[in-house]
């Protein structure tokens, strides 16, 4: 089970592909964001998902929503993944899996494996929506854009 909607997302700090540490509450103060957790750099599904976020980056950017990818891969792997796919957003390395566990994205029977889960957070880091069991990254992103657009209009 993912973290519940309307709960404040837990704070964390992880190394980022931008060369600095990312701290959720500090770096996203007064800014909405998407935290998307994924299993493995360069796997087919994760590559498709990253490319879908890349291809819709401008939509989220115009809505002032930051996209952040998180997996248990090393920073070296993340740097290669980001460069190869020309990703315009940062990736965070959770090599020990602590943040994946905190956000309940680990499979119970295979705790070293992260399941594809996306959290949409508002500017106060409250969870607005959760997407899990993602099989079609394009449908996932389309649904998220529709959800964000509705919430922005309110």
What are these regions (language model features)?
Residues 1-154:
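Chalcogenol-based redox active-site neighborhoods
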